[in-house]
Amino acid sequence: MSLGLFSRAQIAQVNAIAEKSKASLEQSAPKTARSTKGLNAELKAMSDAVIEYFKDSKAILITSKEQLHDYVTNLIDSGYGSLDTETTGLDRIRDTIVGVSLYYPGGVECYIPSKHLVPIFDAPYKDQLTYEEIGEELQRIADSSVKLIFANADFDLSMIYKDLKVDLIKNCYYDVILAWRCLKENERNNRLKELYNKYVLKGKGDPKTFSDFFPPKLFPYCKPEVAKLYAANDAKITYELFTWQLPYVMKDNPKCKKNHLEAISDLIWGVEFPLMGVCQKMHRDGIYIEPSMAEMLNRKYLPIADAELKKLQGMVQEILDNPKYTTRVKRPFLRATDFNPESTPHVAWLCYDLMKLDSGKGGRSTGKEILGTFNAPVAKQILKCRSLGVLISTFVKKLPNAVGPDGKIHCTFKQIGADTGRFSSADPNMQNIPSKAGDIRRMFRAMPGHVLMSSDYSQQEPKLTAYVSQDEKMVQAFKDNKDIYSIIASIAFGVPYEDCLEFKPTGKFDEDGNPIKVYNASGKARRGEAKTIVLGITYGRSVVTIADQLYAHEPWSDEEKIKKAQHVFDSVLNAFPSLRKLMINAQNCAKTNGYVETILGRRRHIPDMQLPEFEFKPMKGYVNPDIDPLDVSTLDNQESIPQRVVDRLYKELTSYKYFGQVAKRIRELAENDHIKVINNRFKIQEASRKCVNSIIQGSAAEQTKLAMLLIDNDPEWNALGGHVILPVHDELIAEVPIENWEACANRLSKLMCDAASFLPFASKCDVTVSYRWNGMEYPCKYPEPNSLDNLTEDEVMWVQYHLFECGYELPVFKTPDGDKPEGDAALGVNGVVTDQYNSYIRDYCNRYNITEDEFIYHIHTKVHTGSAPVKQLGDYKQISSKS
């Protein structure tokens, strides 16, 4: 571009910052180095492509406040409009808005540029509006009753709120992407351009996405008059896709009725769309995290991971040295110490080529679901190493990088993160933080003056299974407040209920009138078997997986484990025929309709249920036996397989009992008859297991979502200052003022139970309160010490707990018998009392000239309340400056 567009002062300013600007551009551009000439050529090619593609566009570029004011006035008058943002990237915290697009019916789409930059110099283009100017006009929309249409509203609402300081939640009327996830959740190409081309243009267009035009990070350097062509079009086609979708989601519309989408309509308008505002609030609120705790966890887990990797490599070396394992396939690693458990070629070679392990599915999968079924210690060790690797790389190392300027992590919440309708989150995925890794979860804490409150449904999915299956025995067990798994074990195995409890009543009572119970190992085993079967049905697990879960540590062969698991599985289903009926009905529904439905009518499409077990296709060289070379009329069918042949082969293959027989016959047909056989049995088996799981898991997700809506709209909860900040499957995490924790706990539990009022038995929620997620419960049950002399065990626990809650890594001592403490104790919480520990505290006070009274005062007034900053306490290592 010509420098004549700038004044001398502007040119001088640009020259002064040129080097800095070039460095900035290099950082924002792809890693491959670009010369100025090369960059300009790339930008020109980009612009030419956009101009050519949108040559018929009528989009307008808004470059003045007056022009924007008039456009917004027309949009408000129309009552409807669509909005889209263009940004520097997808990071909602660190990326920024470059421009905003608007459209209203009967008008012309527009683009409002704000942060487009001149290449090389990073100087802003002329005639752009500031964030404040755009925000002022968008606030007029926020103050009106305009109904806005979005494509991925969650992202646009977040960016507008962060950069433009405008809250458009109440104007958010419709999201074309979210609606389509409800209508057809299994369609993978569900981006705006693909949906618009497929359904509005009937597949006749040429859909090009953002990445087809703009190389990474270069959109801000696109000229505004070029950018408008692409950006404004997004707003326009969003609205047009909305008008196409609308008849299918309006209950009174013939298209909705014809496709039996009335329940989906209720789900969209009554649950998913109202929940968009709740997700926005959770994203904005965020959750505090102490990144420096990651240092401690890194020191803890790295040595463990290294030790487990060395153990694995030692096992690999033993296998390599074992003469019974041989293969002609070249080894993909040089030495055992080079073996990488994350490498698919390494693991596949070891398991399949060398050890000849059989997945039972004919493939070479190295995923968790397959390796977990192998009765081989090395496979279990591979999974253990992978689990530790994920723990360190995904959580310990990455979580601190996700912290925003306010010290919080602001997740992106996906309302339909799974095809079942379950929530998920990203940046980071909080649902993937393992519950067993309590110390990872303890990185998250409440803000000062607040506590975290966790409330989860007690046996949510078993209760929904009882409700959906209408099993009278299960329903009655819940009505009688009996342990459901012990009841199932009792009926299935013909054993008294008390003998299926983990802790069996003795018939005696203590001084307070409580029943005295004794540990019952056989009862625990029976209950565990019943629980594994019921959850296996719910989660769609195969008998092979169930066998591994139940009998992994038994010295039996794989065949014996599977046989035993099948026996237990059949015993439970025979005792509870309604469960078997649920499985059969769900599978039949999927076969007939191609989908199953939840209690609210959400559909989970499972097309593989409608596949034939075997498909037959002619290969090169196939000759139709019905062809008469002298009859010209038969020649058109010479490459087709006659139906009678298909029927005969289908009957033959379905008669085989074992996989090996089927595989052998398929090879013979290919080699001798030139008929390719597609075996769909595995796909159908996998699909069959999804049927019940989709109903139960999807219904559980809906129950949790209904609870979130009740909580968000509850005046009493809001008056108490509580707010939900995180959903994790059947659990909701809330942050509440410390002074209202009891009232909030009662209210949260009631509202969640109210969301399950459709059940024929009482619902129950387990509520815990703590400073940290997965921390010790608040209020602390330990006494406050009055002296540091001769501390009791409870008092040491109390001191350790509160110091840990305020971010101190405490010394850990072995128990009197020499054992190192585990769990919380290993972190200095629930610490062990020893003379060494007592003397440590006294020596600490003497060394730093702190009286015992001062120490106690600090514990009482600073640490206990959590409302004041923690001052440095000598050689206690402070791992966070936040309390």
Kindly give the residue locations of the regions a language model identified.
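Conserved "right-hand" nucleotidyltransferase catalytic core of DNA-directed polymerases
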Residues: S2-P124, I169-N171, E187, L195-V200, ...
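Acidic beta-strand-to-loop metal/phosphate-binding motif
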Residues: S82, S145-A153, L452-S454
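Short active-site loop/helix that positions an aromatic residue
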Residues: L90-D91, V100, D154-V166, A179-L183, ...
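Structural signature of nuclease core domains in nucleic-acid processing machines
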Residues: R94-V146, L157-Y161, V166-N171, E735-P737, ...
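Conserved beta-strand -> loop -> alpha-helix junction used to position metal-binding or nucleic-acid-contacting
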Residues: V166-E185, L192-K193, N481-Y485
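Conserved pre-motif C helix in the palm subdomain of viral-like polymerases
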Residues: N233-E240, R689-D712
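C-terminal structured "cap/appendage" subdomains that terminate the fold
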Residues: I711-V769
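Cell-envelope/ECM-targeting effectors and their regulatory/trafficking segments
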Residues: E784-S883
